[in-house]
């Protein structure tokens, strides 16, 4: 795929990752067309995943589609919220994939988001793209991940190159988990979660964007790719490093029972789950991380926000 002048359609272009990616794409000379769930303004495409509304002709002239939209998982999971988390990912991916497959002039590549939650809670096991997904019968995020990636099959079957970036914990002060952590940590109220032994697989927002661009422009790249830094850490170490970067103590651990009482299944599947994921394919492809270790990553993203 040519490195210059691509026309890229992006869902979730106003989100944490999408907005940073859009800036980088446009700075590199590419044209970005957001897909929006409202009447489209100039330079936008309107679609509605819930109603199945997206005409294949709307993707004519598009070189690549990057699909990032999906319901946030970061709140207590009611039955309705779990349904929204699942449907927002699977319906949107299937609709895009089917529209791409039916288009007369198809985009050459679909980058369709996934997440490391697909692996489930795996203790100390080192996980690569070759590792099997977690048990869908036992883990909601593993179930969602399997179906989310499978929903892109129509595009894959039509010959389109499909990439699934499996996102880890994205570090940015502008949103996501880190933004929620900053206030208590800055007040000196931070602490490990549960035992603190669970692994956290993280990545800086800069490396998220850089890695997506790399795999997008590499013709030989398809399938799943772990978007995580090469040095995952345990929660207790993440806590200590973040406290150190902020020059604050971290004396207040939060018991697992309290987290489960407040957040239910979400706490078990996200905050307390251990997912030690490695970026095997990115490293094999020669991607050079801007922020391979947690301390320098946190220093950079927090300095950039100040």
Predicted regions and their residues:
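NAD(P)H-binding glycine-rich loop region in Rossmannoid oxidoreductase-like domains
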Residues: 41-92
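Glycine/proline-rich active-site loop of Rossmann-fold NAD(P)-dependent oxidoreductases
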Residues: 146, 158-160, 171-180, 215-225
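Conserved Rossmann-fold NAD(P)-dependent oxidoreductase catalytic core, especially the SDR/UDP-sugar
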Residues: 94-138
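N-terminal Rossmann NAD(P)H-binding glycine-rich loop of SDR-like oxidoreductase domains
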Residues: 6-28
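Alpha-helical substrate-binding/gating segment
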Residues: 182-190, 198-232
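Mid/C-terminal beta-alpha module of Rossmann-like enzyme folds, strongest
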Residues: 215-265, 299-306
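Conserved beta-loop-beta element that borders a ligand/cofactor-binding pocket
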Residues: 114, 150-173
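C-terminal amphipathic/interface module of NAD(P)-dependent oxidoreductases
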Residues: 2, 6, 269-306
């Amino acid at each position: 795929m040519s490195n210059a002048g691509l026309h890229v359609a992006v869902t979730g272009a106003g989100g944490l990752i999408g907005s940073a990616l859009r800036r980088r794409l446009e700075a590199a000379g590419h044209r970005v067309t957001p897909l929006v769930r409202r009447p489209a303004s100039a330079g936008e495409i309107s679609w509605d995943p819930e109603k199945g509304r997206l005409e294949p002709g709307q993707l004519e002239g598009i070189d690549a589609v990057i699909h990032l939209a999906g319901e946030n998982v970061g709140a207590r999971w009611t039955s309705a919220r779990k349904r929204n988390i699942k449907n927002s990912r699977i319906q949107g991916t299937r609709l895009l994939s089917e529209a791409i497959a039916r288009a007369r002039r198809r985009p050459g590549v679909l980058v369709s988001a996934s997440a490391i939650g697909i692996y489930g809670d795996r203790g100390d096991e080192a996980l690569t793209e070759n590792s099997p997904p977690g048990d869908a019968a036992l883990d909601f995020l593993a179930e969602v991940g399997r179906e989310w990636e499978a929903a892109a099959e129509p595009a894959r079957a039509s010959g389109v190159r499909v990439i699934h970036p499996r996102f880890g914990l994205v570090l940015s002060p502008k949103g996501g988990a880190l933004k929620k952590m900053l206030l208590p940590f800055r007040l000196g109220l931070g602490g490990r979660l549960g035992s603190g032994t669970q692994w956290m697989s993280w990545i800086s927002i800069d490396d998220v964007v850089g890695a997506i661009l790399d795999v997008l422009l590499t013709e030989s790249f398809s399938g799943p790719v772990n978007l995580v830094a090469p040095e995952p850490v345990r929660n207790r170490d993440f806590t200590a490093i973040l406290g150190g970067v902020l020059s604050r103590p971290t004396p207040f651990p939060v018991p697992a029972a309290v987290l489960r009482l407040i957040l239910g299944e979400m706490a078990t599947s996200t905050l307390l789950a251990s997912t030690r994921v490695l970026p095997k394919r990115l490293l094999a492809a020669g991607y050079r991380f801007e922020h391979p270790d947690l301390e320098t990553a946190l220093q950079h993203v927090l300095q950039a926000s100040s």
